Structure formats: C-alpha cells, structure tokens
Amino acid sequence: MSTESALSYAALILADAEVEITSEKLLALVTKANVEVEGIWADLFAKALEGKDLKEFFFNFSAAPAAAAAGGAAGGGAAAEEAAEEEKEEEAKEESDDDMGFGLFD
C-alpha cells in the first residue's frame, strides 16, 4: 500500500470516529496496519487536514454535481443560441478578410 493511501485511510478513520487528526494518531493507525510511513508524511497530512471537516467535505462534494447538472440543463438553450451567434460573427469576419487583397496567390 502506498504512503498516501495509508495516510488517507487513516485520516478517514479518524474523521469517522470524530477524533482530531494529528500526525501522532495518523502514525499510530498506520503502524498498526503494518505500513511503514516516514513521520514527515504524517506531519504533512495532519497540517493539510488541520481545521477541516472531512465528513462535511464529502457530503457537500456529492451534492454539488447534481446541482450543477440541474442548473446546466435549464440554461442549455441560451448557451446554444450564443454559440450560434458567435459562429455567425466569425464567418462574417472571415469573409471580410478576403476583400482586403491580402491573398496568398494574388
């Protein structure tokens, strides 16, 4: 098992038990699982997760894509119209370039 995976699982276990995530607790869990991890990695994970609620992160993460999909479906028609207008403007600009006499084989 990789260091990152072991520490991630240990952090999730601590968060599920509603225990503060510290480097000492991360190392204790990882060593009980017979995974060798350097102390600096546990310190980095503990500092990165300090003050963050992992449960809230996962609950908000699962709800966000559903809300974005619902909002995108409602406004899809307007976006298609804007794209069509932009294409028409680009075609008009390309045609006007031909009239300037800058052709390659003129």
Swiss-Prot record:
Compositionally biased region (Acidic residues): 82-100
Molecular function as annotated in GO: protein kinase activator activity; ribonucleoprotein complex binding; structural constituent of ribosome
PTM text: Phosphorylated.
Cellular compartments per GO CC: cytosolic large ribosomal subunit; ribosome
Keywords: Cytoplasm, Ribonucleoprotein, Ribosomal protein
Region (Disordered): 74-106
Gene Ontology process terms (BP): cytoplasmic translation; translation; translational elongation
Subcellular location(s) per record: Cytoplasm
A Pfam family per the record: Ribosomal_60s
CDD domains (alphabetical): Ribosomal_P1
Membership in a protein family: Belongs to the eukaryotic ribosomal protein P1/P2 family.
Protein name stated in the entry: Large ribosomal subunit protein P1A
UniProt organism field: Candida albicans (strain SC5314 / ATCC MYA-2876) (Yeast)
Gene field: RPP1A
